Amino acid sequence: MALLISNQDVERVLDMKTCLEAIEEGIKEYYRGDATCRPRIDVWAPSGDPSGYYQWGSMEGTSRCYGVFATRIKSDIAYWTEGEGGVRTQEKYCQRPGLFCGLILLFSTENGEPLAVMNDGYLQHMRVGATAGIAVKYLAREDADTVGMIGSGSMAWTHALAFAAVRKIKQVKVYSPTEKNRDAYARNLAARLGIEVIPVGSAADAVKGAQIVSACTDSIVPVIPGRSIEAGAFVTTVKGTVELDKSSVERIRTFYTFAPNSDAISHSQQGEGVSRAQKISGTHRAYVAGQAEDLARIPEVQREGGFDKRKLVSFKDLLEGQNPGRRDAEEILAVGGNQIQGIQFASVGGATYRLIKEKGLGREFPTEWLLQDVRN
């Protein structure tokens, strides 16, 4: 029997410790050649919604540890808004605002059978936060105890949980354009972690004095004020270099990416030689359909600068000892450009599936519904 697994099922079994362990093992498997993945690719097509565009995204990967292949697929209508403070963001919905469609399909690498269909929402937020947490574990100062958080949504929540799992965090300062959202985030996170969480009125106020700076936004323009980054800080982003302003790019000594080598690091991290499609997607490859009048609906991601390739380093080099990591307490380091999402969905999906089976959760349905006797 296969399983239909809801977000509620995933939340019952997947804690941050489990997620961090699965992500780290998945990364190491990938770098030593025991797992593989295809980076995220999007397909865009004109929509009947005059203010939006259809966006399909998919990514795949394997996990030898859990014996699974995972594909994560998402189907959205993307649209763009300008929020408080003038920050332009990309929003989305499926069918109607407030609903979303994202699925993880899990298959056995032992016999090929379909194992599960999972809602991706909760797992997605956890795996992104855990990935940043792994980077903090290896690259932030050991005494880092203050976080400057830009963003107050689910990604900002899981990032804070991950940081608290790998460092002794004492304080989080949070900024997002909507005051009630940052106030609620501060109140709820303080209750969850038992630490001081302060809502502040600007990104600069969040960043000042923080040893860990994290941007968790849907913005298509830079949000991190580089001049406010403290010496010795470690910076994480969910959108590669999109969230970094020119000063940030200039002050960061090394920008780590999870791509396996410098040649595989996307030009989208460098801000040069990118196609119209990449400028739309921001951090990954995209194929875009539409005439000029259709394409005019889609604003291009705005970057203020790209990294000199000499600043770009693969996390693989760090784990294998070819890169020293943090060399002193004053240098500013950063991580972004996650190109191994498929590995993460396979490893965290595999760990989650195992726990779901152990606890008897999920809804069973006949595997035969997904099989056929006609050769494809």
In which residue ranges do the predicted regions lie?
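N-terminal ligand-binding/catalytic initiation module
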Residues: 1-127, 131-133, 143, 343-346, ...
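Adenosine-phosphate binding glycine-rich loop
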Residues: 7-11, 246-376
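Glycine-rich Rossmann-fold phosphate-binding loop(s) that bind the pyrophosphate
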Residues: 152-153
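NAD(P)-binding Rossmann-fold cofactor-contacting core
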Residues: 166-193
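Rossmann-like adenosine-cofactor binding region
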Residues: 194-292
